Amino acid sequence: MAKRDYYEVLGLSKGASKEEIKRAYKKLSKKYHPDINKEADAEDKFKEIAEAYEVLSDDQKKAQYDQFGHAGMGQGAGFGGQDFGGFGGFEDIFSSFFGGGARRDPNAPRQGNDLQYQMNVTFEEAVFGAEKEISVKKEVECDTCDGSGAQPGTNIKTCSTCGGRGNVHVEQNTPFGRVRSERTCPDCGGTGKEFEEKCSDCGGTGRKVKTVKISVKVPAGVDTGQQIRLSGQGEPGINGGPAGDLYVVFNVQDHAYFDRSGEDIFYTLELSIAQAALGDEVEVPTLEGKVKLTIPAGTQTGKRFRLKEKGVQNVHGYGRGDEYVTVKVMTPVKMTNRQAELLREFAEIDGHDITEQPSNFFDKTKRFFKGE
């Protein structure tokens, strides 16, 4: 199978800058990373993107590729025999030079580009689900020319330079001698079309950039990094092809007092020394409101209670997580004289001879002037 053009893989033109190449690689590699994208061909696309970037990000390799195409990546082209994998055999090299193999019809329908949108949602929206409206800046079909690229009332002709093929034959000297290869037509840009007059609104592209409002249903239980696909909400297709898709990636904001890990949530319960020592019945917050929790006498800091199925529901509907309540016993910082006196009595009964210490500089100063 003939390899795709590296610039095409990254969605770029041949004159793309280093920054454009890097930006395209970061966007596409994130989109097709096998850990994020679970589609069957995601891994193959990810490898193809990485291979294209490896060549186009290196000045020497890029220059060789720009001159000789995929054939320039072989061992005879000065790369020290580096194996890029999947480049095919000797037939593929000559196929790329002499125009063998399948050619893409410039007028064939092609699917539009996919888009990605980073969406912030509150903790509650992620837990319970929500419906929100987002504004996406994207290319849409030009409504003046209906996507044709031609000024209304004018004709579209077959490109006189390439005869509608979208490519032209070029002869050049290579390590294999003088060969004939194919290049994108410089006059029609590969479309195979020639406009009598380009659309005054879109300049002949058939597209315009607009900010479009799209309704998004946030699934209950969604977490940071998870995404949904909105079919057909990407960029418009080419030559009547289907539109691309829009991938919405969620970022869940922090909650005031709940932490989350997967479907489980965590809450820190502060107790006084008396509550922890004597036990108590307290109210703790859950996702649906407050519930009563019994604290046994002698509870220590770090003690964890489990509230079964009080966590977040699984985003796919497979059950629900738990809520974990962790105790933190709070030592009093400011006490009345009576409170301090009772603690001294407790220490004495408990058999502890305590050497009291001031809590801060002002207490030290106060005790100094009192002669303590």
From Swiss-Prot:
**Disulfide-linked positions:** none
Look up and give the organism this protein is from: Macrococcus caseolyticus (strain JCSC5402)
Where exactly are the zinc fingers annotated as CR-type?
129-211
Q: Could you give a single Gene Ontology term from the biological process aspect?
A: chaperone cofactor-dependent protein refolding
**Signal sequence extent:** none
What one GO molecular function would you report for this record?
heat shock protein binding
Taxonomic path: Bacteria, Bacillati, Bacillota, Bacilli, Bacillales
From the UniProt record, list the coiled-coil ranges: none
Annotated residues that bind Zn(2+) 2 are located at 159, 162, 185, 188
Q: Name one Pfam family in it.
A: DnaJ_CXXCXGXG
Its quaternary organisation is:
Homodimer.
What are the annotated GO cellular component locations? cytoplasm
**UniProt: Zn(2+) 1 binding residues:** 142, 145, 199, 202
Q: Supply the PROSITE patterns for this chain.
A: DNAJ_1, DNAJ_2, ZF_CR
Q: Which UniProt keywords apply?
A: Chaperone, Cytoplasm, DNA replication, Metal-binding, Repeat, Stress response, Zinc, Zinc-finger
| Name of the protein in question | Chaperone protein DnaJ
Predominant place of localization = cytoplasm
Specify the domain of life of the species encoding this protein: Bacteria
